[in-house]
């Protein structure tokens, strides 16, 4: 069979298979074109989730008849004036969208440029292009796509129900709307208004936060922490939700690079890493992150739909995201999501919350087979003894008061953020009075976080006990892998892992952190090498150490069912106020719930 050139129509249909996967893909391309045209308002109308009709109208700069003829040709664009594929300043740049859509659907363009006396219309059907004809239309452009995939009926079999396709289209518009709060967006389907995002004016930060709240929900703003960090020319701004304000999926993670919505696995992984010890494994944080960096530091031309990007220094970006979010979370102190109050009122029958109760991962009770217990650290050992057994040189915890000391009432001011302890319920929950209501604290969850943060402090200060291996482990990694690991030997040694080069393509492990016990050394080092190859950095060792610290904190903290005196309860409250991330335990469960006097009066019908 001889080699031949494919006909243009088939070439466009092949391109459409990459660019236009579903109606939402066409919506994305058309709305991005409208944004690039300088529109201040963009209206999207669908029918049957976009399968029978997609209409996008804008008030942008418009196109002349000659420009319309070029716009439906492959690789014709106005967005690369200098033929520079590196410093791209527009959302679209390939000139593929309109010809690709026109090859698989019935496409009609109607446009009127600024200053023109009339508008023109052009039709493309199954790749066949007509001629521009006069039309009536205000300044701007309207593009109609009818019968999507009629020219490639096999693609129709892969579309979902109209409602599902509408959901995908709405998500596209929401993400683009968040990146451009100064533009008004609307979405309708079958005559029903689905989205109506008014343009936001005023101070840019406030306008952006208001638009995000429009999309995510009004509860986001009071439960979000502002981010603003910069490192080596890369700037990160945005908001990160409190750990106790979370979702069942990652759908509420909004990521933007130079104003472009992306779903980049490096960024998603960095977000997950930042929340690793404050969120349950089956829960996902709510974030809106905006990365700004020099265009030549990021390649946006690596994905057919431009949904992914590639960073020149991925380790820098990952480190910036993790560091900025962790810094914001630490600054939140004991703060917990305001939605917990609504959940609590709902559970009490007050009807104060519309949100379903959050789900938190179940964690098992201590097991005697844990390496920590085998090392002689009992699940209920006093805190000071447990920490000394770890080899972390931390100050011992305050001693537990003897029973006779528990009789005094204890004095504390209700003006403290977490108030003054008044009672203990079922030897498990502390009830504290605040200036404007009360706080209920889960004593085990709260103390678990306090212990964990003390253990983490030992890790960050390099106070990690090591144990030498009787028989050093030789790990074959290949030349590249061994070079990456030995290059980071100094950083690893600070975490208790001592590694040396051992001939071509191999390393030898001489000491490991005492915390790891009899962990799989070979597997650990291979994981380190893999992460270094992919990201330029590795958190495998740190994550394993933190996991063990979390287990120890769970085992070594005050248990439910233990009676505390009022002074002990107040001491716990004061330590919570001074400890980062104390609004949730290591498993992501909230440590306390606040009820205002107004909330309590609602329960009794006083308001």
From Swiss-Prot:
One of its GO terms (biological process) is mismatch repair. Keywords: DNA damage, DNA repair. This is DNA mismatch repair protein MutL. It comes from Paramagnetospirillum magneticum (strain ATCC 700264 / AMB-1). GO terms for molecular function: ATP binding; ATP hydrolysis activity; ATP-dependent DNA damage sensor activity; mismatched DNA binding. It comes from the Bacteria. Pfam families: DNA_mis_repair, HATPase_c_3, MutL_C. GO terms for cellular component: mismatch repair complex. SUPFAM superfamilies: ATPase domain of HSP90 chaperone/DNA topoisomerase II/histidine kinase, DNA mismatch repair protein MutL, Ribosomal protein S5 domain 2-like. This protein is involved in the repair of mismatches in DNA. It is required for dam-dependent methyl-directed DNA mismatch repair. May act as a 'molecular matchmaker', a protein that promotes the formation of a stable complex between two or more DNA-binding proteins in an ATP-dependent manner without itself being part of a final effector complex. Belongs to the DNA mismatch repair MutL/HexB family. The gene is mutL.
């Amino acid at each position: 069979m001889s080699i031949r050139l494919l006909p243009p129509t088939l070439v466009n249909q092949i391109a459409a298979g990459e660019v236009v996967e579903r109606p939402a893909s066409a919506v994305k391309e058309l709305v991005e074109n409208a944004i690039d045209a300088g529109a201040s308002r963009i209206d999207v109308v669908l029918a049957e989730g976009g399968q029978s009709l997609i209409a996008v109208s804008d008030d942008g700069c418009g196109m002349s008849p000659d420009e319309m003829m070029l716009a439906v040709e492959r690789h014709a664009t106005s967005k690369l004036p200098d033929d520079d594929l590196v410093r791209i300043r527009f959302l679209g740049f390939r000139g593929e969208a309109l010809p690709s859509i026109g090859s698989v659907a019935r496409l009609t363009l109607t446009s009127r440029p600024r200053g023109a006396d009339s508008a023109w219309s052009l039709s493309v059907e199954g790749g066949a292009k007509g001629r521009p004809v006069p039309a009536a239309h205000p300044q701007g452009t309207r593009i109609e796509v009818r019968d999507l995939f009629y020219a490639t009926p096999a693609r129709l079999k892969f579309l979902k129900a109209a409602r599902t396709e509408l959901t995908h289209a709405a998500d596209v518009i929401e993400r683009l709307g968040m990146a451009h709060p100064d533009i008004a967006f609307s979405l309708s389907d079958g005559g029903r208004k689905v989205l109506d995002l008014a343009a936001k004016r005023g101070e840019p930060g406030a306008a952006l936060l208001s638009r995000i709240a429009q999309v995510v929900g009004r509860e986001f703003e009071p439960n979000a922490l502002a981010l603003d960090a910069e490192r080596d020319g890369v700037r990160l701004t945005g908001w990160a939700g409190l750990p106790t304000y979370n979702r069942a999926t990652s759908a509420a993670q909004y990521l933007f690079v130079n104003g472009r919505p992306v779903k980049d696995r490096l960024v998603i992984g960095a977000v997950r890493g930042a929340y690793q010890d404050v969120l349950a494994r089956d829960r996902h944080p709510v974030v809106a992150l905006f990365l700004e960096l020099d265009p030549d530091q990021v390649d946006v031309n690596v994905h057919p739909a431009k949904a992914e990007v590639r960073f020149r220094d991925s380790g820098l970006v990952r480190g910036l995201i993790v560091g900025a979010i962790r810094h914001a979370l630490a600054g939140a102190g004991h703060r917990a999501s305001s939605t917990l109050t609504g959940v609590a009122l709902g559970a009490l029958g007050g009807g104060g919350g519309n949100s379903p109760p959050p789900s938190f991962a179940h964690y098992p009770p201590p097991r005697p087979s844990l390496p920590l217990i085998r090392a002689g650290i009992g699940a209920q050992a006093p805190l000071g003894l447990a920490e000394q057994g770890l080899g972390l040189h931390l100050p011992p915890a305050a001693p537990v008061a003897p029973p006779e000391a528990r009789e005094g009432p204890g004095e504390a001011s209700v003006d403290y953020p977490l108030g003054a302890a008044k009672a203990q319920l079922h030897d498990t929950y502390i009830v504290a009075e605040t200036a404007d209501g009360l706080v209920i604290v889960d004593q085990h969850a709260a103390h678990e976080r306090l212990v964990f943060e003390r253990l983490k402090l030992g890790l960050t200060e390099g106070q990690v006990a090591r144990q030498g291996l009787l028989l050093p482990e030789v790990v074959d990694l290949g030349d590249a892998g061994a070079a990456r690991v030995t290059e980071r030997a100094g950083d690893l040694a600070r975490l208790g892992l001592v590694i040396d080069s051992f001939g071509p393509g191999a390393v030898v492990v001489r000491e490991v952190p005492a915390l790891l016990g009899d962990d799989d050394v070979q597997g650990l080092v291979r994981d380190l090498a893999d992460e270094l190859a992919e990201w330029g950095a590795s958190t495998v060792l740190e994550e394993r150490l933190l996991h063990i610290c979390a287990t120890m904190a769970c085992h070594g903290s005050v248990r439910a069912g233990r009676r505390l005196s009022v002074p002990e309860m107040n001491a716990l409250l004061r330590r919570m106020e001074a400890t980062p991330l104390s609004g949730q335990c290591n498993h992501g469960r909230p440590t306390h719930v606040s009820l205002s006097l107004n909330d309590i009066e609602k329960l009794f019908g006083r308001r």
